[in-house]
Curated annotation (Swiss-Prot):
Keywords: Ribonucleoprotein, Ribosomal protein, RNA-binding, rRNA-binding, tRNA-binding. One of the primary rRNA binding proteins, it binds directly to 16S rRNA where it nucleates assembly of the head domain of the 30S subunit. Is located at the subunit interface close to the decoding center, probably blocks exit of the E-site tRNA. It comes from the Bacteria. GO terms for molecular function: rRNA binding; structural constituent of ribosome; tRNA binding. Pfam families: Ribosomal_S7. This is Small ribosomal subunit protein uS7. NCBIfam families: rpsG_bact. Belongs to the universal ribosomal protein uS7 family. It comes from Aromatoleum aromaticum (strain DSM 19018 / LMG 30748 / EbN1) (Azoarcus sp. (strain EbN1)). Part of the 30S ribosomal subunit. Contacts proteins S9 and S11. InterPro entries: Ribosomal_uS7 (IPR000235), Ribosomal_uS7_bac/org-type (IPR005717), Ribosomal_uS7_CS (IPR020606), Ribosomal_uS7_dom (IPR023798), Ribosomal_uS7_dom_sf (IPR036823). GO terms for cellular component: small ribosomal subunit. GO terms for biological process: translation.
Amino acid sequence: MPRRREVPKREILPDPKFGSQDVSKFINVIMQAGKKSVAERIVYGAFAQISGKAGKDPLEVFSSAVANVKPVVEVKSRRVGGANYQVPVEVRPSRRMALSMRWLREAARKRAEKSMAQRLAGELLEAAEGRGSAMKKREEVHRMAEANKAFSHYRF
């Protein structure tokens, strides 16, 4: 446990285009090497493709994609008497959001389309429908937790 006081969470300003804190958070997740304008171009480009290609509201698609990918449980390693057990634990709401955004980013990066905006749009559309690599990752994490249910009494 840290001895100093707990550092308060920073307030993230909503993004200028959609007025959503979640979109702003997602832009920060996409950002590499501090290039926020590039990250904004990628995310807004993906949203434009979603509204153009699918004819759906990009904010609704984004929020449903993030909600679908959110994990409920995950496994954490716990050492008990010389053996490491994978103990299933419930995921905190803030971590759920962070994990789902991270998984969406990684799934988009692995796709085959040309631009990152196209890859991100495709992954968001698939995740909103309950398909795609990010959903596969979530199912994998849930499967691991289910398989190690026997060790759930080793709480943290």
